[in-house]
């Protein structure tokens, strides 16, 4: 089964995990980027997203230069913003047909997973969303709180899926 890693990363933590998975699995990887980049000021982004959360605002993302139909398994990486998948990932899930695909999500956060995985399942009702992994970092840091062994076990599990 052909695997693709799809992720969005603001602080670099989700990117770090996505690339760790890519190194081990040697599969394709796709970084989601917004058309209008987020501010480099973390507090500004947090405030903006808190204000737009109630409206379910979804940012426009850059065109994907990949044929998703060629992949059976999507390894989906998202930071958790306001207890749910970040807006760019929600845009990706809303705009792309992932029916029949297996989605293995991982979420990076500082300990506030919230409804992230349930929302991914809701956005992909005709996909098989399973084997979710919550990866926790220290607040405002790239220091992992989740044991590295747990992450390696997660990657090993994905590798065994055929």
PLM features per residue range, with description:
Residues 48, 101-102:
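P-loop/Walker A phosphate-binding loop and immediately adjacent motor/lid segment at beta-alpha junctions
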Residues 68, 94-100, 123-128:
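Short, conserved loop/helix-junction motifs that constitute active-site signature segments
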Residues 12, 77, 100, 111-114:
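Glycine-centered flexibility sites
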Residues 1-76, 83-85, 90, 94, ...:
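N-terminal beta1-alpha1-beta2 submodule of the flavodoxin-like/Rossmannoid cofactor-binding fold
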């Amino acid at each position: 089964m052909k695997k693709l890693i799809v992720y969005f990363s603001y602080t670099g933590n989700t990117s770090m995990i996505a690339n760790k998975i890519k190194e081990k699995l040697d599969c394709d990887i796709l970084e989601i980027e917004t058309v209008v980049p987020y501010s480099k000021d973390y507090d500004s982004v947090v405030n903006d997203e808190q204000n737009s959360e109630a409206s379910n605002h979804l940012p426009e993302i850059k065109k994907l230069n990949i044929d998703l139909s060629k992949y059976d398994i999507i390894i989906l990486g998202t930071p958790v913003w306001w207890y749910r998948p970040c807006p760019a990932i929600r845009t990706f899930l809303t705009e792309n047909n992932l029916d029949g695909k297996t989605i293995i999500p991982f979420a990076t956060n500082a300990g506030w997973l919230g409804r992230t995985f349930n929302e991914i399942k809701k956005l992909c009702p005709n996909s098989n969303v399973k084997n979710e992994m919550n990866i926790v970092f220290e607040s405002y840091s790239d220091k992992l709180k989740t044991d590295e062994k747990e992450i390696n076990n997660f990657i090993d599990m994905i590798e065994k899926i055929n």
